[in-house]
A protein has these predicted regions:
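N-terminal basic, low-structured, amphipathic or hydrophobic segments
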Residues: 2, 18-22
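Short Lys/Arg-enriched helix C-cap and helix-to-coil transition segments
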Residues: 152-164
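Cationic, low-complexity basic patches in intrinsically disordered or flexible, solvent-exposed regions
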Residues: 16, 32, 47
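Major-groove recognition helix of helix-turn-helix-like DNA-binding domains
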Residues: 132-148
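A cross-taxon signal for low-complexity, glycine/charged-rich
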Residues: 7, 13, 23-37
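Single, function-defining residue in the core of a domain
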Residues: 40-117, 121, 146-149, 156-157, ...
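Extended, structured, electrostatic nucleic-acid-contact surfaces
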Residues: 125-132
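A short, well-structured juxtamembrane/interface segment
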Residues: 162-169, 229-230
Length: 460
């Protein structure tokens, strides 16, 4: 073969036998051997490879994305047990529960407002979803999963995360303060088959028990908006010995009596027209916001001559707030100071701030489904996202504001960065030695020497 040095024919024969090529492929094989032995490419430049670079091991460490750091906080063992318990992966045609959770959490952290936006965004990050344990999902599959998958799976995961956060705030039972309230969210008219509130208005309610010291919810119940607050409260678990603070939406003497029998301290409001039989008038400091401090009894009889179950000695404290309005604060605590009781009721605003933060930061204003199950899943996963942000924020403390931290997470969600370095500029890439360098076409004598060495190596 013209132009080939002695010894190349041996290589060609062995390569042809190894690859099983016919004889007419001899020309193409000769060109490939030239590239392998001589380093001559189609541009007729000599390709010289550094021996050390060819065997160099890539020591660059893999950097997970920010979303992965958030998902690490999830107790996946408990989650898998919940999936099996509720048979959540019963249908292979529906997206798996883990991929469903990851997609919905991406919508919460990333601010996606529709199923189509979730589908498109996940497709653009398909290569990164593998390390998360997720996958791309179509909007039809996600819609079906929201409508059919049991919401109890995600409710159980929410309870596990709540318990994990609560474990870091060990206190005496008497020091536990629990705030109870609800918030309403508006739904589209397509949810009218289960969430009709009035003519043309549909909505749902999220009933929450909130711990102001730990700054986290402890209990969640989602109902249609026409369900009364006290109806949901009667199904809430009661923690014996804790202090419960709530507003006039939970005005029920029977429920108050059940809290009193459990040893709980009650701090709430009395209606303006509620009679109060005074037994003792206590002194108050002049010039303070406390107008009066009295002990006595509630009415013995209710409507339709029903007996009042709240028959023990109780206390009424009249307070003037900043707006000049007078409040009648009710409590069954006869020993604490009037100012302490007033301050406890003032702490009720912490749950209102929590509702505002969740509505402004997470996605419960635009719902991805119209069924009751889909709404329950989205609200539950929104609170799961809140707890994951809390766990990550407590572990890093790169910023003091939870809102600023949530914005940083949203901006860098799919970036390969550490959560602790979100405020720092990304490091500059280190200059690397080129794997190849180009030299002019080597001389015929150099080719002959290299071919001879290659022939000896193959023969050996």
């Amino acid at each position: 073969m013209p132009g080939l040095v002695p010894g190349i024919h041996v290589l060609l024969a062995r390569q042809r036998e190894r690859r099983g090529l016919p004889g007419q492929a001899h020309g193409r094989l000769a060109q490939s051997v030239l590239e392998e032995v001589h380093g001559i490419d189609s541009t007729r430049f000599q390709l010289v490879t550094n021996h050390l670079d060819s065997k160099r091991i890539n020591t660059v460490q893999h950097q997970n994305i920010v979303f992965h750091s958030l998902l690490k906080q999830i107790p996946w063992t408990i989650f898998d047990r919940l999936v099996e318990q509720h048979d959540a992966d019963w249908d292979d045609r529906v997206v798996k529960t883990k991929a469903h959770l990851i997609a919905m959490l991406y919508a919460q952290f990333g601010g996606a407002r529709s199923l189509r936006e979730i589908e498109t965004s996940l497709k653009s990050h398909a290569s990164k979803l593998y390390h998360l344990g997720g996958c791309t999902v179509s909007r039809s599959a996600l819609s079906t999963a929201n409508a059919r998958r049991p919401a109890e799976v995600f409710a159980g995961l929410l309870s596990a995360l709540m318990a994990r956060l609560q474990a870091g705030y060990r206190r005496k039972i008497g020091d536990c303060v629990r705030l109870i309230d609800s918030t309403s969210v508006q739904l589209s008219g397509l949810s009218g088959h289960w969430a009709t509130f009035s003519a043309g208005v549909c909505g749902a309610k999220a009933h929450i028990i909130y711990d102001p010291d730990a700054d986290q919810p402890l209990y969640l119940m989602v109902t249609p908006s026409n369900v009364n607050d006290i109806t949901a409260a009667k199904e809430m678990p009661i923690e014996a010995g804790a202090t419960y603070v709530f507003d006039l939406g939970y005005y029920d003497y029977g429920w108050w009596a059940s809290l009193d029998q459990a040893g709980c301290r009650i701090v709430t409001r009395l209606k303006v027209n509620t009679p109060f039989k005074v037994v003792e008038v206590r002194s108050v400091a002049s010039g303070s916001s406390i107008l009066s401090d009295r002990t006595g009894y509630l009415p013995k009889r209710l409507a339709a001559s029903r007996k009042n179950p709240m028959s023990n000695l109780v206390r009424e404290i009249r307070v003037v707030i900043e707006t000049g309005k007078m409040l009648r604060i009710f409590t069954n605590d006869l020993t604490a100071s009037a100012q302490e009781i007033a301050d406890l009721y003032k702490r009720r605003w912490a749950i209102e701030l929590f509702f505002r933060w969740v509505k402004q930061t997470l996605k419960i204003a635009h719902f991805l489904g119209t069924s009751e199950n889909a709404v329950r899943i989205q609200i539950t996963i929104a609170l799961i996202a809140f707890l994951l942000l809390r766990l990550a924020h407590d572990a890093t403390k790169i910023v003091t504001s939870p809102l600023a931290f949530a914005r940083l997470i949203r901006t860098n969600l799919m970036h390969r960065r550490s959560i602790t370095e979100l405020l720092q500029p990304p490091p500059k890439p280190k200059p690397q030695q080129p794997m190849f360098k180009f030299e002019p076409h080597a001389t015929r004598a150099v080719q002959r020497r290299r071919a001879s060495r290659a022939t000896c190596e193959v023969a050996a």
